[in-house]
C-alpha cells in the first residue's frame, strides 16, 4: 500500500505540472485514475455503437441491446468511462452519475446513407456535455 501511495503521489505531482486548467486536470484524473484500471490507462466502453452500426450487431448477444445492461457492464466490468450519445446520456446518466464517467459523443453516423458517404452530423454540443457532467467529449472523423 505504501508503494502505491508513493506512486500516486508522484503521479499527482506530475499532473499538477500539466498546463491544464484545474477542471481539465480533474476530469482527466477521474478518467485515468478514478475509475477503471486506475493506473493511467483508459478503458472506454463504446455505447455509441448502437447508432453507428444498427441493431443487427446485437443479434449474437440479445441482452446487449438493453442500455441498462450496457451501463451495468461498464460499472461491473471496471471500465474507465462510457462513450455515448446525448439521448442515452440524458435518459441514463442520472441513475449512473458518479458510478462511471461519461464521454459524450458529439457526432455520429448510421448506415443510412451508405458508408460511401462520410456524413457524420453533429447532434450534441460541448454545452450538452457540461450540462450532463461529461468528463470528455468524443468526435468521430472519417478521413479519405
PLM regions and their residue ranges:
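N-terminal basic, low-complexity leaders that serve as flexible interaction/assembly modules and, when applicable
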Residues: 1-47
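Alpha/beta enzyme core
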Residues: 2-4, 37, 42-44, 49-144
Amino acid at each position: 500500500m505504501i508503494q502505491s501511495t508513493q506512486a500516486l503521489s508522484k503521479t499527482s505531482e506530475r499532473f499538477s505540472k500539466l498546463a491544464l486548467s484545474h477542471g481539465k486536470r480533474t476530469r482527466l484524473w477521474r478518467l485515468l485514475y478514478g475509475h477503471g484500471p486506475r493506473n493511467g490507462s483508459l478503458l472506454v466502453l463504446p455505447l455509441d455503437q448502437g447508432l453507428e452500426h444498427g441493431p443487427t450487431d446485437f443479434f449474437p448477444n440479445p441482452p446487449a441491446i438493453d442500455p441498462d445492461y450496457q451501463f451495468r457492464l461498464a460499472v461491473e466490468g471496471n471500465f474507465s468511462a462510457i462513450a455515448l450519445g446525448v439521448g442515452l446520456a440524458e435518459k441514463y446518466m442520472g441513475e449512473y452519475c458518479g458510478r462511471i464517467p461519461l464521454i459524450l459523443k458529439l457526432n455520429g453516423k448510421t448506415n443510412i446513407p451508405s458508408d460511401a458517404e462520410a456524413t457524420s452530423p453533429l447532434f450534441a454540443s460541448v454545452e450538452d456535455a457540461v450540462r450532463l457532467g461529461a468528463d470528455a467529449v468524443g468526435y468521430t472523423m472519417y478521413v479519405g
